[in-house]
Regions:
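N-terminal secretory signal peptides that target proteins for export/translocation
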Residues: 1-9
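Periplasmic/extracellular electron-transfer cofactor-ligation site
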Residues: 33-75, 81, 85-86, 97-106, ...
């Protein structure tokens, strides 16, 4: 009887480990898909912004966690400069959703993304740019 329980427990443990590994694989795949989709969505942003420093808007490479309105070579709006923001996840999320509502008077003409999934994906892409 004890041998049967030990065997059953071993099988349950193996099944749990396999299940955990499959969840990790699905999670990694979802994260990669979000990043890829975020890069695709960024093409809208790339009309002005770049990751190479040659856009009409400021370069956004490494923007996550940085102070807003501090990139050299760009004339930011007084509205953005006066807010004293740091590009945290919450601030980026609000700005990407509706730039004019978050910083009235910003030079950003993009109206924003409505869907939470789109914002999540763009954030994943922005965080990857280092």
């Amino acid at each position: 009887m004890k041998a049967l329980r030990a065997t059953s427990l071993a099988r349950i443990g193996a099944a749990a480990a396999l299940f955990g590994a499959s969840l990790a694989a699905v999670s990694a795949t979802a994260s990669a898909a979000d990043l890829v989709r975020g890069e695709q969505l960024f093409h809208t942003c790339a009309a002005c912004h770049s990751v190479l420093g040659d856009g009409i808007g400021p370069d956004i490479t490494g923007i996550y966690g940085q102070p807003a309105a501090m990139r050299p070579g760009f004339n930011y709006s007084d509205a953005l400069k006066q807010r004293g923001l740091t590009w945290t996840e919450a601030n980026l999320r609000a700005f990407i959703h509706n730039p004019q509502a978050f910083v009235p008077g910003t030079l950003m003409s993009f109206p924003g993304y409505e869907r939470t999934a789109d914002i999540d994906d763009v954030l994943a892409y922005l965080k990857s740019l280092k």
